[in-house]
């Protein structure tokens, strides 16, 4: 089986893949990533005392908005009618990390992997933005696709 990039034509020009002949099916993508912060920042996030307000609440909304805007950020992504997007947080006190997980659903003819990854990335960047006044050394890491369900290429699990 030959692997080839499908966003290029035979001359190497960037193209948007034609998904018009694909069946509309339910597709789900789950992505996650982490941000490591210092102890003061972790406590401010956990206790909701950051100067800019509810860090996780604002970050959640930013992530959902980003999922909806992915095609405006990633040049060859199709605009999608997302049917659901959730952003969840796990506070990890031992490592002073916040883990973000996004789950995006669509009933359509192309997947939502980029939407899930964009949601996680933007959520993490929003946490950074809201906390940078007290912690400029925060580190964002391990952004990755954990699971893809549905579509022509089948399911993918990376957990």
Swiss-Prot record:
Pfam families given in the database record: MoaC
Gene3D superfamilies: Molybdopterin cofactor biosynthesis C (MoaC) domain (3.30.70.640)
A single GO molecular function term of this UniProt record: cyclic pyranopterin monophosphate synthase activity
Pathway assigned to this chain's UniProt record: Cofactor biosynthesis; molybdopterin biosynthesis
EC number: 4.6.1.17
Binding site for substrate: 76-78, 114-115
PANTHER family the record matches: CYCLIC PYRANOPTERIN MONOPHOSPHATE SYNTHASE, MOLYBDOPTERIN COFACTOR SYNTHESIS PROTEIN A
Family to which the UniProt record says this protein belongs: Belongs to the MoaC family.
Assembly description: Homohexamer; trimer of dimers.
Protein name: Cyclic pyranopterin monophosphate synthase
Organism: Clostridium botulinum (strain Eklund 17B / Type B)
